[in-house]
């Protein structure tokens, strides 16, 4: 199923543009970036029929949000967006492969799932993640969504993060109440829940938490991706005032998302 929405540009500072694309060429380039990050860097066992591409059935139903470097003419950041209507056509949210979301999805409101978020290794520590996150918040708030949901990954091993240390570094206000807690279909094995005192939180998870995201229970062990996934729920009502003051100040005329691009 092909997306029928027009390309929607969101202005970003300096050399970066962030926009939703329906271009098959750009989507394929994004899938190449995903493959580099998830398969080559993280060691994921991707169930793809095309070597060098990360592709699955969700790609045909979702929106593809990319950060594009105009100077080097390439995609340097990516996430995909799946709303509840697209998920219904697909048959599920991607996160439902890992968690039972029955109680969460029974809440009133509109849901937007984010996934496959990645940044080109050469651009980490730059403005790419901030640009991507700013555009994502703009899209969600202007689209009238009530919740962002998705999975934040924790890579284990010496070069990764210790899940217990991550939990110790999460503020109590970012731990979901019991009504939002979900159960993973495959819990993390005890052997991987190492207790070393490594500090720090993965950058993407840190960005979610900074905006008030809730960690909703125990992580899922994703053997294919060689990582632990935390289910994240971000209520958007609390972001609307912050968004309008921070992201829209002086940019109302140029940063609007076209109505046709919102489902």
Show where each model-derived region lies.
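Short amphipathic alpha-helix that is part of the acyltransferase structural core
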Residues: 3-76, 80-83
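A broad, low-specificity signal for short, low-complexity segments enriched in glycine/proline
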Residues: 23-30, 38-43, 73-79, 108-111, ...
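Residues that form generic nucleotide/phosphate-binding pockets
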Residues: 33, 169, 246
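Short, surface-exposed amphipathic charged segments that create phosphate/polyanion-binding patches used
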Residues: 36, 233-234
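Acyl-donor binding region in acyl/amide transferases
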Residues: 84-214, 219-227, 232, 239
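Long, contiguous binding/interaction regions
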Residues: 238-240, 244-247
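Short, cationic low-complexity segments
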Residues: 250-263
